[in-house]
Amino acid sequence: QLASDDYGHMRF
């Protein structure tokens, strides 16, 4: 699932 981490990047 896609989720934006604390850095604002997209992680799969």
From Swiss-Prot:
Myotropic peptide. The modification Sulfotyrosine is found at residue 7. It is found in: Secreted. InterPro entries: Gastrin/cholecystokinin_CS, Sulfakinin. One of its GO terms (biological process) is neuropeptide signaling pathway. Belongs to the gastrin/cholecystokinin family. Its main location: secreted. The modification Phenylalanine amide is found at residue 12. Keywords: Amidation, Hormone, Neuropeptide, Pyrrolidone carboxylic acid, Secreted, Sulfation. One of its GO terms (cellular component) is extracellular region. Disulfide bonds: none annotated. This is Sulfakinin. It comes from the Eukaryota. The modification Pyrrolidone carboxylic acid is found at residue 1. One of its GO terms (molecular function) is hormone activity.
